[in-house]
């Protein structure tokens, strides 16, 4: 097969591992920077171009689109879809998962365990918003944040009011969530592929830090999932419409709660912690599911 990997970073671990796994299986692989693509959209024959040349036909596309280029990257991916190329994760699923608030609303509708989450627009609503999530300590998150950036733990009510007011004053979109103290600064990353969790790791925050992201100095280790954790991770990925997802959950006193569903999960941490060939499993999944049938994206949710 001819496979396109949409990525701005050909030297990134995840991209290199996917290229390596695909080539080992005899596939032709092209790493394409979505920001270098431009599109011809017409009723006869749509196409994608780079540097004055039309891209050749592809059998499958694996999107590794960074959060900062979600809009343009999704548009390029959608163009591949309109041209009948199989997308490992489609543009609708990616856009849905990148909107943190929308993700929470969709999972709530499906009865998936979540931290109590509040969202408001006016400073006058702040006191009620804080009460809604159980008071301080609480977590304040920028909706556009990634890798733990834009996430604040407010340990007192006064601190919470000040931080929320400041974000509102900057016209930043935030959500407020209950703080799951019993998680002790640890979360679990479940790597979902299709209808299975193929790997999982526990991420522990550094001492004095509550964010467990590996980019923030957290450490990763093997973890044994409960059947409930496995089930809720798969349901969360399905709710987003994703074939591949990194589902982050916390162990709370009332069961697993989903923090985030990542449509472009990194491979380095999960492969390092579990020694599993996750990249190879992804390519095997693409081989089984790529079909040369024109696919039209249908937005749902």
Curated annotation (Swiss-Prot):
Q: Which GO terms describe its molecular function?
A: ATP binding; metal ion binding; ribosomal S6-glutamic acid ligase activity
Assigned keywords, A-Z: ATP-binding, Ligase, Magnesium, Manganese, Metal-binding, Nucleotide-binding, Protein biosynthesis
Please list the residues that bind Mg(2+) 2: 260, 262
Q: What is its EC number?
A: 6.3.2.-
Q: What is the cofactor note? A: Binds 2 magnesium or manganese ions per subunit.
SUPFAM superfamilies linked to this entry:
Glutathione synthetase ATP-binding domain-like (SSF56059)
Q: Does the keyword ATP-binding apply?
A: yes
Does DNA damage count among this protein's keywords? Answer: no
Where on this chain does Mg(2+) 1 bind? 248, 260
Intrachain S-S bonds: none
GO CC, sorted alphabetically, is:
cytoplasm
Question: Could you tell me which Gene3D superfamilies the record lists for this protein?
Answer: 3.40.50.20, ATP-grasp fold, A domain (3.30.1490.20), ATP-grasp fold, B domain (3.30.470.20)
Q: State the family named in the UniProt similarity comment for this chain.
A: Belongs to the RimK family.
Indicate what this protein is called per its UniProt record. Probable alpha-L-glutamate ligase 2
Q: Which gene encodes it?
A: rimK2
